[in-house]
């Protein structure tokens, strides 16, 4: 799962409110309907490779590296000040301003922390101006350590504390090998995940710098974006894997109830947390459905079927 088979992207840098540069890549034809992809914790643009490959033929696909991930450097602020939900929203606003024209609308898709980014930005003028619809994919608004089932204990304070300790560990992840892939698969993917997809996810996650991994883990441990969730007053689809240990389906169901305009909930049987990699066709289909409905886009494949 790489971006090497795609045409070279148009790369640019968006500058966030605190001066942090954000690496952005744009795929697909200029002037095509826009999709903005926001990845999750410890991932990068490469996490969306299958969606970019499928959508870039008839969409302008905008993907960016969250600060501290991929080619976006860590914030200059020390002591964790550069890691916050405000920073997530600032970075997304900067990306929208750098890539979309005045009044231009896009479908936004966020996976895990990328979905939290969209919730954090819900009240921002840029989101209201540019977002036509949203896909919240394998994410949650609050109570992340309380609801996660990575630690195989009954719900309660001990499980929550152990989960926070595991996810917030400062130790390096080490090399990608059979043991590390087994651990990553258990924590983040469904039991039937193909070895190649486990390998791809492991390489992406292990490439995340330790400082960014730890800095963002502290934000996620205390996350509360329930107000932002309720402020997403636009069409929002929700997707989750039934075997997700990091953001179990309880989060998706809470979001469905809280969202002012939820278009539906998709639960993918047997899939874990890494749904864009584990079930790329299903995630891409949800994005296409949103672009068709809210941007009036008909895919090239649908056009061929009509002409046949």
Regions from the PLM with identified roles:
Residues 20-81, 95:
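Conserved HGGG/HGGXW glycine-rich cap/lid loop of the alpha/beta-hydrolase fold
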Residues 245-251:
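Conserved alpha/beta-hydrolase "acid-adjacent" motif
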Residues 261-308:
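Catalytic active-site module of serine/aspartate enzymes centered on a nucleophile-bearing elbow/loop
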Residues 123-168:
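Flexible "cap/lid" loop of the alpha/beta hydrolase fold
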